[in-house]
Amino acid sequence: MFRGSIPPLPTPFRRGRLDEEALRRLVERVVQGGSHGVSVGGTTGEPGTQTLEERKRAIEVVLDQVAGRVPVIPGTGALRLEETLELTRFAKEAGAQGAMVIVPYYVKPNQEGLYRYFAEVARTVPDFPLLIYNIPGRAGVEIAPKTVGRLRRDFPNIVGLKHSSKDLEYLSHLFLEAGRDFLVFCGLESLTLPMMSLGAVGTIAATANWLPKEVALLCEKALAGDYQGARELHFHLLEANEAIFWDTNPIPLKTVLSWMGLLEKEWRPPLGPTTPEVEERLRRMAERYGLLPKEKEAA
């Protein structure tokens, strides 16, 4: 099923509207770079600033551009269950291969509430693979391994989880509760290799928008058991992985992608541009990785 590098695409805007041409360019960059899948509408895509219709259109554009070459796994979670159900049904009907549903944010539900929330999503699309998106730093709550295990036993279409936390002990308990064949993806760029050494099958890393070949190769080496080769790539990618978080994601990501000519340097409020100091750090990082056009390097 799903494995390897599945880049979470940023949502490109131009004068406040979805820039479909830029989104298609991003798809081509990561697919031609060897990525094993594509995700749209996750944290990197600023979904909380978009209407459901905008999110649906982004899914349609990505599916059309990918054209079946790799799996597409949109983020379909929202705060309101009804919106999550609508967007998840839409993703399935549009032809996506699965969906990633974030732990509901802000309201800080208890574990029984989380179980019932994900159970309703799973019942609504019973033959559609679902990944739970565990991101306690944004959601304000973490879904417990026991809750995930319960969901996995009750709903076979809950096939995996994206883990966006530095807590590696969580993974050990997760595999014990949900099974060693549960599909875990790393959601923190610099922890891809550590998580894969514990049994994760890949990464959903924003860095792969900058360096798709390198991130895909790291995953391939780890999956093949070539941990020496994977370690070399881990250290090679470390600065880029850390740079994603020099400001709120996706601000650094979009800043560098704009210099690369792939999209406009534009976000939806309340996000805004980073500081000149961070921009200078990003410019030096991008130069070291060979990401900038020659004229930008000389500027």
From Swiss-Prot:
Q: Which GO terms describe its molecular function?
A: 4-hydroxy-tetrahydrodipicolinate synthase activity
The record's keywords, sorted A to Z, are: Amino-acid biosynthesis, Cytoplasm, Diaminopimelate biosynthesis, Lyase, Lysine biosynthesis, Schiff base
**Pathway(s) of this molecule:** Amino-acid biosynthesis; L-lysine biosynthesis via DAP pathway; (S)-tetrahydrodipicolinate from L-aspartate: step 3/4
Tell me the GO BP annotations in alphabetical order. Answer: diaminopimelate biosynthetic process; lysine biosynthetic process via diaminopimelate
- Show the disulfide pairing: none
SUPFAM superfamilies for this protein: Aldolase
Q: Which reaction does it catalyse?
A: L-aspartate 4-semialdehyde + pyruvate = (2S,4S)-4-hydroxy-2,3,4,5-tetrahydrodipicolinate + H2O + H(+)
The terms describing its cellular component in GO are: cytoplasm
First-listed, main subcellular location of the protein, grouped into a coarse class: cytoplasm
According to its UniProt record, where is this protein located?
Cytoplasm
Residue numbers for the site described as Part of a proton relay during catalysis? Answer: 43, 106
Q: Which residues bind pyruvate?
A: 44, 204
First-level EC class: lyase
Query: Which Enzyme Commission number(s) are on file for it?
Result: 4.3.3.7
Q: Where are the transmembrane segments?
A: none
Q: Which residues form the active site?
A: 133, 162
The UniProt similarity line reads: Belongs to the DapA family.
Q: Which PANTHER family match?
A: 4-HYDROXY-2-OXOGLUTARATE ALDOLASE, MITOCHONDRIAL (PTHR12128:SF66), DIHYDRODIPICOLINATE SYNTHASE (PTHR12128)
HAMAP family under this entry? DapA (MF_00418)
| Subunit structure comment from the entry | Homotetramer; dimer of dimers.
Q: What's this chain's function? A: Catalyzes the condensation of (S)-aspartate-beta-semialdehyde [(S)-ASA] and pyruvate to 4-hydroxy-tetrahydrodipicolinate (HTPA).
**Protein name (record):** 4-hydroxy-tetrahydrodipicolinate synthase
- Tell me the organism's taxonomic lineage: Bacteria, Thermotogati, Deinococcota, Deinococci, Thermales
